């Protein structure tokens, strides 16, 4: 939440779509837009975000928006294409690739189907890890915390890269 697009405070689909559009204008064309925390249950109209809507607002970036529960993603058409997800792609065991009433992809991936997209995301760079660590430390200090620990040394592509980032930042 500290360095990615935080969608948890938005109270409507329109707000989320505008935030995604604005964020996309701050990054290089073609770079992934990754947002987290949308929750349609807090909106006046409890309807999820669909690929067609994301396509209208952000046509030149692949978009992946994680729902607050982490059990669903909203993905635009470019993101689905990068993951080679088509109308013929079978749902993986334990996952759902949602389609509309006409059998077309609607951009929602649930549970294990999310892995189809996660597998094509660019690897996290050491620079990104350093930026994330700096943001986390700054936030901890702001909250009055002076120490902490992590259990995620392998979360971002392996122990070595994460450890090197820690050594440089701390």
Language-model-derived ranges and their functions:
Residues 1-170:
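Divalent metal-binding segments
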